[in-house]
Every structure is written in structure tokens, then in C-alpha cells.
A protein has these predicted regions:
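Anion-binding (especially nucleotide phosphate/pyrophosphate-binding) glycine-rich loop
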Residues: 1-131, 135, 139, 143-145
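Long, positively charged amphipathic alpha-helical accessory segments at protein N-termini or as interdomain linkers
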Residues: 142, 149-170
Length: 170
């Protein structure tokens, strides 16, 4: 876990707007994420992935949590399907490239969508007739109410066109 005060977010948003966060915490593991409970009670928090779906107009007077948990691996593979696990901090295009490099088809229409893997379920990203829900099995979700990690399967996510349960919750 890396913590910085009065931190520029210029390199953490696609518009490259040079605003500052009162505090910036980079999370590099699931264990660090769970430890946030001890650090952030009653704090104003913004979770930030790749910064491609946010427009900062002024400094952020709170704590920005940058989820930088990396890792992509093939969990299961047979002649019918494959299961690939990708962590929240992975760049979406890098994830697609990993799949294509390993001859795992079905996701190629989703290439070059900006952002990180962790934000893909929020928007139910899609392009050229394919949506995330078409190739999605499950995701681990960090619950900010009790600082626990829960598993959401396809039906739990309530995917709709460019929408999911993650947009509808507080």
C-alpha cells in the first residue's frame, strides 16, 4: 500500500487534468484492500481505476483509492470454454491481448475500450454486438459498507445495456 498526500491525479485520468487529491492510496493486493477498514472510517472516498470515465473539475478533498491489483491467468481450459481470471488493476486492452495471445476467442470485439478490468462490470462494456455479460462468469466485489469481499455471479450483476447493479447502488 502506497500513501501520498496532496497528490496530483494528472497521470490517473484520461483527460490529464492536473487536480490534486488530499490523500492518494494505491492498493496492490486484496489484503491491502481489506486493511482499508482500519484507515478510512468516516473518510470521503473515491475509488479510481484507469480514470477513463471521470472528469475532474477541481481538487478532490478526500481520499482517492487507486486499485492497482495486477494479474491475469487461465484458471480452467478445455475444448468447450476457458475461464480467465483478471484482477481489477489490469488494463482492459492488455486483458484482451492476453486472451488473443492465448487463442481465447470471444472477446476480440471488446478490444481498445479504455479503462481497467475492474470497471468493466460497472458499465457492462460492449462493442460490435458483444457485451461483457456475454463472456462473463463472476467477479469479486469489495463491499465498502463492511470492507468485505463478496463474489457476484452473472445474475447477481444484473447486467443491462451499459448498466449493472454496481451503478444502481449507493
Amino acid at each position: 500500500m502506497i500513501t501520498k498526500k496532496n497528490f496530483s491525479l494528472k497521470n490517473h485520468n484520461s483527460f490529464k487534468i492536473d487536480v490534486k487529491a488530499k490523500e492518494f492510496i494505491e492498493i496492490n493486493s486484496k489484503e491491502e484492500l481489506i486493511k482499508l477498514n482500519e484507515l478510512l472510517k468516516n473518510e470521503k472516498i473515491l475509488f479510481l481505476g484507469g480514470g477513463s470515465n471521470i472528469l475532474f473539475t477541481k481538487d478532490y478533498d478526500g481520499t482517492v483509492i487507486h486499485l492497482n491489483i495486477k494479474g491475469i491467468n487461465i484458471e480452467k481450459e478445455n475444448s468447450d470454454f476457458s475461464v480467465v481470471k483478471a484482477n481489477t488493476g489490469e488494463n482492459w486492452s492488455d486483458f484482451i491481448e492476453f486472451c488473443l495471445d492465448n487463442n481465447l476467442g470471444g472477446v476480440e470485439n471488446l478490444s481498445l475500450i479504455p479503462g481497467n478490468v475492474g470497471s468493466a462490470p460497472v458499465q457492462n462494456i460492449g462493442a460490435y454486438g458483444v457485451e461483457l455479460k456475454d463472456v462473463f462468469l463472476s467477479c469479486e466485489v469489495f463491499n465498502t459498507d463492511d470492507f468485505s469481499i463478496k463474489n457476484f455471479d452473472l445474475s447477481d450483476c444484473k447486467f443491462e445495456y451499459r448498466n449493472s447493479i454496481f451503478k444502481k447502488r449507493k
